[in-house]
C-alpha cells in the first residue's frame, strides 16, 4: 500500500519559524501587479505577452523545489531536465544553456561542473527575491549577449521607509518526503538607509513515484545574504551586498552526487534618478560570484561496481580517491567506480554594468556598457589548475519612440567583444570574436478595444559557452580540436503576439519563428554515453504560448494556457532533439472573502519527434515519451492582513509518469541505460506566509 504523508511538524513550530524568518515587498509599480493572495498555478502576462512578471514569494502549484529551475517551470513555455529532486536545468521553448540568460540582481552566477550538475539556477533561492521577470526571445539587448531564447531576471527591490521601521515577510513549508523549508527576509531602516537580511534553508528526502518506488533525490541547502543601503534621498541609492550558501543533492540520473555547492557573492550598486529634464537616470553595479563545487560517489550513496548514465564529470575535472586519476571522458561506459572518488571544480565570475536613461519629448534612450570575466579551475593533487577564462565586453542602446497614444516603436543594438583562453600543458589556445545583436519591435494598442498587438524581429550571435567548448570528446567533423572548431550561433527570430484585457475575459498569445545558423548540437556514441561530439548544424524553430482567463462570477474563475515548441535540424532533415511536447494547463478557481481554492489539470501530449542520441551537454533523446494527465488542487485562507495559510496536494491520483526532457537513471541505483526518472507521486504540502 502506497503512503505519502507529511513529516510530523507541529503547527506551533511552523508558525514560530515563519514569524522569525521574513521578505520585503518594496513599493514599486511592478510589485503592484503581483497578486499574492492566491496560490499561483498559471502565470499570465501583466502588460505584454512578451514579458512575464511574477513574485517568487507567491505559493505555487505544483510545489517547486528550492532552486530557480523548478520555479520557472510554472511559467508556460518552460520545462526542465531532471537530475533528481532539485537542481534541474531549465529549458525555454526547447532552448537550453546559455541561450537563456539567468541573472540575479543584474549579476550572473555560473556553475563549475563540466556537465552542469550545478547549473546556474541551482544557486538561486527564488523566495529571496521580490520579482521574477522573463523577456522572451532576442527582444532586448540590455542584459548581455547571445540571449536567443530569452532573459530571466530575479530581482530584489529597494525597500522604502518613511520613518524608522522594520518590515518583512516569512514563509515555512512542510510537505511529503520529509520536505521542510523556511525562508526569511527582514528589512530595517529609515529615510537615510536600510539593512536587509535574507536567509533560507531547505531539506527533503528521496521522493516516491506513483508506483511507490523511491527515487534517489534527497537534498539539503541553505543561503544567507545581507544588503546595506544608503538612501540620502528618494532618488539616490548606494547598496553593498554579500552572500554565502552551500548544499548537497543526490542525483538519480548521474554517476556522482553533488556534495558541495558553496557560493560566495559580493556586489555594489549605485542608482541616481530624476537627475535632470533630459538625463533622467544613471545606474551601475559590479559583482563577484564564486562557485566551489564538489561531486563524489560516496557521501550520498555507496560506490557501486558499475555506474552507467551520466558520469557527472568530464575531462576538465579530475577524479581523486583510492585509485589512479581517471579522465571520465575517455574512461568508457563501463568505467569502474567501485572505489570512492571525488572531483572539485570552481568558477570565479566578476562583472559590471552601467547604464544611463535619457527622456525627451516622445523618446526614451537607454544606453550603457557591461563586462564579465569568468575563470574556471579544477583541482588535482590538492592544487588548483586553471583551464579556461572567458572575457566579454559589450556596449548597448535601446530606443523607445512613443509615436502616438496607441503606438510605440522599440529598437536596440549591441556589440560584444569576446576573448577566450584555453590553458593546457601542451596545447594552450586563444579565441576572439565580435558579436553583433539587434532588434526592432512595433507595439500598438487599439483605440476603442482593449487589445494590444506587437511584432518584432531580432538577431543575436552567441559564442560557444564553457560546456560546449570543453566538455565534448570531439568537435565538428570528428576533430580533437574542439576549442577552435565550434562556431558561434547566429539566430534570426520573428516574435509576434497579442493581448486582450476585458472585464470578464482576458486572453494572450505569443508566437515565434526563427532560423539558427551553426546551432550547437551534441551527438552521443550509441555504445558509450561518455563519448560525445559537438557539431554545428542549421535549424528552424517555431512555437508559442497562449492563455485565457474567464471570470465566470464574482467568486469563480477559470484559466487555461498552452505551450508548444517545434524544431527541425535542416542540415540533416530530421527533428531537433530535446524539444518538449505540447502542454496545456487548465484551472478552475474559487475565491470568497478570505478563502480561495483552485484545481489544476496539466495535460502533456506524447513526443514522437526525436533525434536518438542527440541533445546537449546534459541530456539527449533516448526514446519517445508517452502523454499524461496530472491533477492537483489547493486551498488558501487569509487569516488577516499579515498571515496566509495555503495547502494542497500535487498529483492527486498518484500518477506514474516521466517528463520527456529527462536524464536516464543511473545504473548504480538499478536503472537501465534508457530508463527515465519518474516524477513525484502524490505529494501533500502546506505553506505559511507571514508579512509584517
Stretches found by the model and what they are:
Residues 402-409, 511-516, 534-614, 653:
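Gram-negative outer-membrane beta-barrel transporters
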Residues 33-71, 89, 225:
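N-terminal periplasmic "start-of-domain" segments of outer-membrane beta-barrel proteins
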Residues 246-248, 290-292, 375, 417-426, ...:
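Surface-exposed extracellular loop regions of Gram-negative outer-membrane beta-barrel proteins
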Residues 153-155, 160-163, 169, 180, ...:
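Periplasmic-side early beta-strands and strand-to-turn transitions of outer-membrane beta-barrels
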Residues 204, 217-219, 235-282, 289-309, ...:
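Flexible loop and strand-edge segments within Gram-negative outer membrane beta-barrel domains
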Residues 59-62, 66-72, 88-91, 103, ...:
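N-terminal periplasmic accessory domains that precede
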Residues 108-136:
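Short acidic/polar hinge/loop motifs at secondary-structure boundaries
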Residues 225, 334-356, 392-396, 483-487, ...:
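Outer membrane beta-barrel strand-and-loop segments of large Gram-negative receptors
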Amino acid at each position: 500500500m502506497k503512503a505519502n504523508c507529511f513529516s510530523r511538524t507541529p503547527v506551533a513550530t511552523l508558525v514560530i519559524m515563519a514569524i522569525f524568518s521574513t521578505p520585503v515587498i518594496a513599493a514599486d509599480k511592478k510589485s503592484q501587479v503581483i497578486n499574492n493572495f492566491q496560490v499561483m498555478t498559471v502565470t499570465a502576462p501583466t502588460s505584454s505577452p512578451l514579458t512575464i512578471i511574477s513574485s517568487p514569494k507567491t505559493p505555487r502549484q505544483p510545489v517547486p523545489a528550492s532552486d530557480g529551475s523548478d520555479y520557472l517551470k510554472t511559467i508556460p513555455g518552460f520545462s526542465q531536465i531532471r537530475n533528481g529532486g532539485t537542481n534541474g536545468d531549465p529549458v525555454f521553448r526547447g532552448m537550453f544553456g546559455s541561450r537563456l540568460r539567468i541573472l540575479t540582481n543584474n549579476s550572473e552566477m555560473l556553475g563549475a561542473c563540466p556537465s552542469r550538475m550545478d547549473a546556474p539556477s541551482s544557486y538561486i533561492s527564488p523566495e529571496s527575491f521580490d520579482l521574477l521577470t522573463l523577456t522572451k526571445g532576442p527582444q532586448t539587448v540590455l542584459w548581455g549577449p547571445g540571449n536567443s531564447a530569452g532573459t530571466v531576471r530575479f530581482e530584489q527591490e529597494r525597500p522604502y521607509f518613511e520613518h524608522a521601521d522594520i518590515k518583512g515577510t516569512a514563509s515555512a513549508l512542510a510537505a511529503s518526503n520529509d520536505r521542510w523549508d523556511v525562508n526569511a527576509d527582514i528589512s530595517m531602516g529609515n529615510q537615510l538607509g536600510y539593512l536587509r537580511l535574507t536567509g533560507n534553508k531547505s531539506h527533503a528526502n528521496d521522493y516516491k513515484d506513483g508506483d511507490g518506488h523511491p527515487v534517489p533525490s534527497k537534498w539539503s541547502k541553505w543561503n544567507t545574504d545581507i544588503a546595506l543601503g544608503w538612501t540620502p534621498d528618494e532618488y539616490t541609492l548606494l547598496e553593498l551586498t554579500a552572500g554565502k550558501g552551500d548544499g548537497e543533492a543526490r542525483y538519480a540520473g548521474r554517476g556522482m552526487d553533488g556534495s558541495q555547492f558553496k557560493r560566495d557573492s559580493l556586489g555594489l550598486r549605485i542608482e541616481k534618478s530624476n537627475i535632470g529634464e533630459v538625463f533622467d537616470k544613471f545606474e551601475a553595479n559590479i559583482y563577484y560570484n564564486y562557485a566551489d563545487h564538489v561531486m563524489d560517489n560516496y557521501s550520498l550513496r555507496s560506490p557501486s561496481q558499475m555506474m552507467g548514465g551520466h558520469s557527472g564529470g568530464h575531462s576538465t575535472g579530475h577524479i581523486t580517491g583510492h585509485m589512479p586519476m581517471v579522465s571520465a571522458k575517455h574512461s568508457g561506459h563501463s568505467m569502474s567506480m567501485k572505489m570512492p572518488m571525488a572531483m572539485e571544480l570552481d568558477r570565479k565570475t566578476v562583472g559590471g554594468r552601467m547604464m544611463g536613461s535619457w527622456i525627451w519629448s516622445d523618446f526614451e534612450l537607454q544606453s550603457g556598457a557591461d563586462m564579465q570575466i569568468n575563470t574556471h579551475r579544477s583541482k588535482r593533487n590538492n592544487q588548483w589548475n586553471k583551464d579556461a577564462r572567458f572575457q566579454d565586453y559589450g556596449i548597448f542602446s535601446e530606443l523607445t519612440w512613443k509615436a502616438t497614444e496607441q503606438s510605440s516603436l522599440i529598437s536596440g543594438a549591441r556589440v560584444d567583444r569576446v576573448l577566450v583562453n584555453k590553458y593546457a600543458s601542451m596545447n594552450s589556445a586563444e579565441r576572439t570574436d565580435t558579436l553583433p545583436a539587434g532588434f526592432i519591435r512595433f507595439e500598438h494598442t487599439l483605440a476603442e478595444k482593449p487589445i494590444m498587438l506587437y511584432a518584432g524581429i531580432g538577431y543575436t550571435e552567441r559564442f560557444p559557452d564553457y560546456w560546449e567548448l570543453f566538455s565534448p570528446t570531439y568537435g565538428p567533423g570528428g576533430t580533437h580540436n574542439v576549442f577552435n572548431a565550434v562556431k558561434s550561433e547566429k539566430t534570426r527570430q520573428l516574435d509576434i503576439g497579442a493581448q486582450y484585457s476585458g472585464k470578464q475575459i482576458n486572453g494572450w498569445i505569443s508566437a515565434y519563428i526563427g532560423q539558427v545558423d551553426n546551432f550547437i548540437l551534441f551527438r552521443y556514441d550509441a555504445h558509450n554515453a561518455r563519448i560525445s561530439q559537438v557539431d554545428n548544424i542549421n535549424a528552424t524553430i517555431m512555437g508559442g504560448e497562449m492563455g485565457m482567463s474567464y471570470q465566470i462570477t464574482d467568486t469563480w474563475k477559470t484559466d487555461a494556457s498552452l505551450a508548444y515548441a517545434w524544431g527541425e535540424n535542416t542540415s540533416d532533415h530530421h527533428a531537433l532533439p530535446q524539444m518538449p511536447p505540447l502542454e496545456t494547463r487548465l484551472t478552475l478557481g474559487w475565491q470568497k472573502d478570505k478563502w480561495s481554492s483552485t484545481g489544476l489539470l496539466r495535460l502533456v501530449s506524447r513526443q514522437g519527434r526525436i533525434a536518438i542520441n542527440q541533445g546537449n551537454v546534459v541530456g539527449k533523446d533516448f526514446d519517445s515519451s508517452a502523454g499524461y494527465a496530472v491533477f492537483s488542487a489547493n486551498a488558501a485562507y487569509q487569516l488577516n492582513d499579515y498571515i496566509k495559510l495555503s495547502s494542497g496536494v500535487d498529483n492527486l491520483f498518484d500518477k506514474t509518469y516521466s517528463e520527456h526532457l529527462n536524464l536516464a537513471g543511473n545504473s548504480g541505483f538499478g536503472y537501465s541505460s534508457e530508463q527515465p526518472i519518474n516524477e513525484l507521486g502524490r505529494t501533500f504540502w502546506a505553506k505559511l506566509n507571514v508579512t509584517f
